[in-house]
Amino acid sequence: MTTALDQLKQYTTVVADTGDFQQLAQYQPQDATTNPSLILKAVQKDAYKPILEKTVRDHRNESTDFIIDRLLIAFGTEILKIIPGRVSTEVDARLSFDAKRSIDKAHELIKLYEAAGIERDRILIKLASTWEGIRAAETLQKEGIKCNMTLLFSLVQAAACAEAGAQLISPFVGRIYDWYKKQAGADWDEAKNGGANDPGVQSVRRIYTYYKTFGYKTEVMGASFRTTSQIVELAGCDLLTISPDLLQKLHDSNETVTRKLSPDALHDKPTERVAIDEASFRFQLNDEAMATEKLAEGIRVFAADAVKLEKLIEALR
């Protein structure tokens, strides 16, 4: 029997969401994504502590920020030895509301990759889908630096990213699901709100349909999954980035996977484009409590993990 993972790969580009690059080869993903939380998790494992220690040792007299950049590139370079495609490396979440500094940081990361012999076509710079992050992406894309827009929870964010010419977006399925489940509390009905009715799945389907209806080239990569059901319901999405735990479950499963999303079979097609000038963007995002709260929370979590990573580095000096 063909595994669920192999079936999924017939319809969707499978991406591994991890800093634990030793797990990559067995799943044969095309691309890989990282974020501050995943890098922090990886460097605390015995297998990866030597990378952290060597990076600190080699740059002991440099700033902590300087060392973190080189640590990100060290992980990205190792990942690119294993996968044929692209790796996503994230700009510090503390720059999420500063377009200029985000652009500057992206330039630094690209220069470090190029100095390591990695072509920029194999790199996606991850930026938070704030107004400022999207403006940074617009500038970077014009310079030939491809961007992956993360912490995306709403159609207005997706529309703004597409208008800015972003290479790729990462709508967060699981975190959307988490919010609605928490809001419902004891009234949550998993049977009613799971599968195709999962609010995170529905959000990605809506964004995918919007993009394909209006001919945007920006890639849609579902992210932040909690279950294999969420993944299977989005078979046919341009890309899906999946944790090693869920990749293993798909690998071990013989469940039949059928295509659920296709540009040739769009349902509930929108008739108008979303207004995305700055005032409209901010109002629409503010008007959607889930998106506003999860974006803010996501930035806080990634920023906090960046601080934890800094403390690990300081302890090794």
From Swiss-Prot:
Top-level class of the enzyme under EC nomenclature: transferase
- Name the InterPro entries on file: Aldolase_TIM (IPR013785), TAL/FSA (IPR001585), Transaldolase_1 (IPR004730), Transaldolase_AS (IPR018225)
Question: Which reaction is the catalytic activity of this chain?
Answer: D-sedoheptulose 7-phosphate + D-glyceraldehyde 3-phosphate = D-erythrose 4-phosphate + beta-D-fructose 6-phosphate
Keywords, comma-separated and alphabetical: Cytoplasm, Pentose shunt, Schiff base, Transferase
E.C. number: 2.2.1.2
Q: CDD domains this protein is in?
A: Transaldolase_TalAB
Question: What's one GO-annotated cellular component?
Answer: cytoplasm
Q: What's its job?
A: Transaldolase is important for the balance of metabolites in the pentose-phosphate pathway.
The protein's name: Transaldolase
Name the source organism: Burkholderia multivorans (strain ATCC 17616 / 249)
